Amino acid sequence: MNNTISPGEVLKVIKERIENFDNQVKSDSVGEVISIKDGIALIYGLEKAKFGEVVVFANGITGIVLGLDCDTASVVVFGDERSVGEGDTAKCTGKLMDVPVGLELLGRVVDALGNPIDGAGSIDSKTRLPVEIKAPGIIARQSVTEPLQTGIKIIDMLIPIGRGQRELIIGDRKTGKTAIAIDTIINQKAHNDVVSEKEKVYCIYVAIGQKNSSVARIVDKLRVSGALEYTIVVAAGASDTVSFQYLAPYAACAMGEFFRDNGMHCLIVYDDLSKHAVAYRQMSLLLRRPPGREAYPGDVFFLHSRLLERAAKMSDKEGGGSLTALPIIETQAGDVSAYVPTNVISITDGQIFLESEIFYKGLRPAVNVGLSVSRVGSAAQTKSVKKVAGSVKLSLAQYRELEDFAKFGSDIDVHSQKVLDRGRRMMELLKQKQYSPLSVPEQVAVIFAGTSGCLDGVSVSDISRFEEMLLKELNENYPDVLSSILNNFTDDVKDLLLEIIGKVTSNFE
């Protein structure tokens, strides 16, 4: 038996090996940690690093490049900095920071990286989107035309919000800012229960620098009210590093853009951007960027403008989806002229201004109607709301003016006294308990009772009881009237509503 191998066979094997030889050399940009403190790692050797690029450390923790010098890169660490030490290797990934997005995140509580923190298992999301993305251009947008109902009378009637709008909620601490945002999320349930998946309003609540106990309480309230099923909660608590607090709103916005860009509707609440600006200031100072006014870096305006500009009502060509933003700003002693508040006021399409003085008077929601404005929302109001709410703002302004005058104890003529009496009743009508949103027809019926003069004979102390009785009467005995108000508030419907209001007011004579 001949076991010799011919030179031809050897040559054939060598040729095959040469042809199939993969000579690709993989090039990695690898550096070494030369110092780490306060969540900032200084890395030497990342010559090909780009601004905003994701870096992976030897132990698997990620970071993002936010500073580049001639031979070093400053990387903000996402995670426990104690597990990163001097001499550790760090590698560029060539990718920008992205997060999981999609319907799979609904009903879950996640951190700024999209990792679940609610103990309910992993999230099987098939799509990821970058956290930083350019806002839609002018051509890709359309005007705000659809209303976003909050369920709060004073807002839906006087400071209406439309889908795709950015409406700032601003006020001192403990004046009910978060309460308005949570009520708005809860109010979407009634709408979502009766419409298709495409028409639902999905919600995202972003907690930035909040106490974990406060976030847990909000999540529990959303769960009890049935709102968590269409809501994503993104939490970067006070105990989390500033890097997570900085990233959270951008990550949440990317999650919201998934709905917007797929022809769906989304509401996002940033609670709050004051703490976000403080986190960014701390990070910028650690990165040795030059401080400006109030020690904020020079690009603090761009910090929020590039975030809020991503909220938009898309054109029909782009799917017609929307992303509505409700940023929250906390003021100090009612000072709206401070640096960050004025920045965000100039970026948004209006503001709901909450005042401590009004809050302590028991007028809640504590909205200052005179200082609050919605620049584009009125175009989205329904016809029935416009008919009823048109005169309310003017009559309240007249009431406030006369109220200040009446404090001097001067004699007041009959007409002025009538304005004062009706104004007091209207202020009482605009009060609303937390977690008790009203539908649009219910709001129209209640406000119409005040503007029509039907309550002139009802004492101010009985107004809240009258409201309860009117809503009970309408829901139990006249549901067709409520649906008529929603569709078209004709004179016939008005007459029937006046009859029902008269029937209820007769109990207070």
UniProtKB/Swiss-Prot annotation:
PROSITE patterns for this protein: ATPASE_ALPHA_BETA (PS00152)
Keyword match Transport: yes
Coiled coil: none
EC number: 7.1.2.2
Protein keywords: ATP synthesis, ATP-binding, Cell inner membrane, Cell membrane, CF(1), Hydrogen ion transport, Ion transport, Membrane, Nucleotide-binding, Translocase, Transport
Reactions this protein catalyses: ATP + H2O + 4 H(+)(in) = ADP + phosphate + 5 H(+)(out)
Site-annotated residues for Required for activity: S372
UniProt GO MF annotations: ADP binding; ATP binding; proton-transporting ATP synthase activity, rotational mechanism
Keyword Nucleotidyltransferase assigned: no
Pfam families, alphabetized: ATP-synt_ab, ATP-synt_ab_C, ATP-synt_ab_N
Record-annotated disulphide pairs: none
GO cellular component, one term: proton-transporting ATP synthase complex
SUPFAM superfamilies assigned to the protein according to its UniProt record, in alphabetical order: C-terminal domain of alpha and beta subunits of F1 ATP synthase (SSF47917), N-terminal domain of alpha and beta subunits of F1 ATP synthase (SSF50615), P-loop containing nucleoside triphosphate hydrolases (SSF52540)
Subcellular location: Cell inner membrane
EC primary class: translocase
Function statement: Produces ATP from ADP in the presence of a proton gradient across the membrane. The alpha chain is a regulatory subunit.
Assembly behavior: F-type ATPases have 2 components, CF(1) - the catalytic core - and CF(0) - the membrane proton channel. CF(1) has five subunits: alpha(3), beta(3), gamma(1), delta(1), epsilon(1). CF(0) has three main subunits: a(1), b(2) and c(9-12). The alpha and beta chains form an alternating ring which encloses part of the gamma chain. CF(1) is attached to CF(0) by a central stalk formed by the gamma and epsilon chains, while a peripheral stalk is formed by the delta and b chains.
Protein name (database record): ATP synthase subunit alpha
Organism: Ehrlichia chaffeensis (strain ATCC CRL-10679 / Arkansas)
Encoding gene (name): atpA
